[in-house]
Amino acid sequence: MYLVVGLGNIGKEYKKTRHNIGFDVVDIVAEKYNIEINRQKFKGSYGEGRIGNEKIILLKPSTYMNLSGESVIEAANFYKIDKENIIVIYDDMSIDIGKLRVRGKGSAGGHNGIKNIIQHLNSDIFPRVRVGIGQPDENVVNYVLGKFSKDQREVIEKVLAMSAKACISIVEDGVTEAMNKYNGVKIEV
């Protein structure tokens, strides 16, 4: 069983912002596998389904980004999911737009949502899909809560689809295979 967590902030004003990439990827996986994310529990919205023979729980925490660990630990404990089977998808400023990076473990890298998840799980050993949003020329908060330009949006839509495939690959083939397949791929305008 896998817990697939997309990080983001709830509310219409955050829809399609850089910081909500995790929510967008989870929505793509949900659509592909006909999973309705319509239940409220674990301080978030979630739905259950299958990828092949694996049961998956798709979770969108409603705690706001910096408290995402509260939602993740509740769902993980309820379903008794191993940390190695918790996949977290989130935006990453240290990666260029058009790229993603799959990792099996690692530090928070300055991302407060991941930092909070690491604190609650008491571990940094969980797979993640880091989706590049590029470096800001402006205030970081304004940047991550801002929307992509039209040209960037074209690239991001393709990256979101690729990120969903990377999540699915982790479930079906394992983290190493997903890393080999998706790390280093760059989508251009």
Swiss-Prot record:
GO cellular component, one term: cytoplasm
Keyword Transferase included in the entry's annotation: no
Molecular function (Gene Ontology), one example: tRNA binding
Residues flagged as site, Stabilizes the basic form of H active site to accept a proton: D91
PROSITE patterns linked to this entry: PEPT_TRNA_HYDROL_1, PEPT_TRNA_HYDROL_2
Positions annotated to bind tRNA: Y14, Y64, N66, N112
Assembly, per entry: Monomer.
Stated role: Hydrolyzes ribosome-free peptidyl-tRNAs (with 1 or more amino acids incorporated), which drop off the ribosome during protein synthesis, or as a result of ribosome stalling.
NCBIfam families the UniProt entry points to: pth (TIGR00447)
Protein name listed in UniProt: Peptidyl-tRNA hydrolase
Originating gene: pth
